[in-house]
A protein has these predicted regions:
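N-terminal, polar/charged subdomain of small-to-medium soluble alpha/beta proteins
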Residues: 2-203
């Protein structure tokens, strides 16, 4: 389970600044309310794992539905809002019944549930594969979509806590041994290049 960001083992941490909760940047002002499922953990086919095998692997899912719930508050009728139980069960069913061949297929499938099964006007999903890369905590993808396609969208590929050994510094004693550096890599818009190749180019 991804419990947070750990410190570098030795002296320093090189970090590419990012916002882990991207909904604070992409949400639309006309939809002030959010219904979320956080860190749903499933096992499913989601592409190759860190050893190049096409086998079920752990997948962590965050899903956010953006809406306006004032009508439900006034009427006290559940049909006027979005049911997080419906979202949760649909995501679990998707994981159990679907064999995806890539990370982006998982993300698009979850987004389809948010917009078309749960009828959210705007949604975000964040998918993490904690066993996708040997030298990183996770590979992931963040998508933001509007049902009517009028709001801004986001496609972002993420590599979290990529561990790299590198020579740091210009002094002679600093160049005798490599130091451990931990890097977060975000690519936006998401590239078609596999995250394995991106991680290898950094590593």
């Amino acid at each position: 389970m991804l419990l947070g960001r750990t410190a570098v083992k030795r002296f320093m941490s090189l970090r590419i600044p990012r916002s882990h909760l991207l909904y604070t940047h992409t949400r639309t002002p006309s939809l002030p309310d959010r219904i979320s499922v956080h860190d749903l953990q499933v096992r499913m086919h989601a592409g190759l794992d860190a050893w190049g095998r096409f086998v079920p692997q752990p997948v962590h899912i965050d899903a956010h539905l953006y809406t306006e719930v004032s009508r439900a508050g006034q009427s006290d009728h559940v049909e006027h809002t979005h049911n997080y139980g419906t979202l949760y069960r649909a995501l679990e069913r998707f994981a159990a019944d679907t064999h995806c061949t890539s990370l982006d297929q998982v993300a698009e499938g979850c987004m389809n549930i948010c917009l078309n099964e749960c009828h959210a006007p705007y949604a975000e999903v964040h998918i993490r594969l904690p066993r996708a890369l040997l030298h990183a905590d996770a590979a992931g993808m963040i998508l933001a979509r509007a049902k009517d396609e009028t709001a801004n969208v986001l496609d972002q590929l993420c590599i979290q806590q990529l561990r790299v050994d590198a020579i740091l510094g210009v002094n002679p004693w600093e160049r005798e041994r490599k130091e451990r550096v931990i890097v977060d890599v975000d690519v936006s818009p998401a590239t078609c290049a596999p995250y394995e190749a991106i991680a290898h180019s950094v590593y």
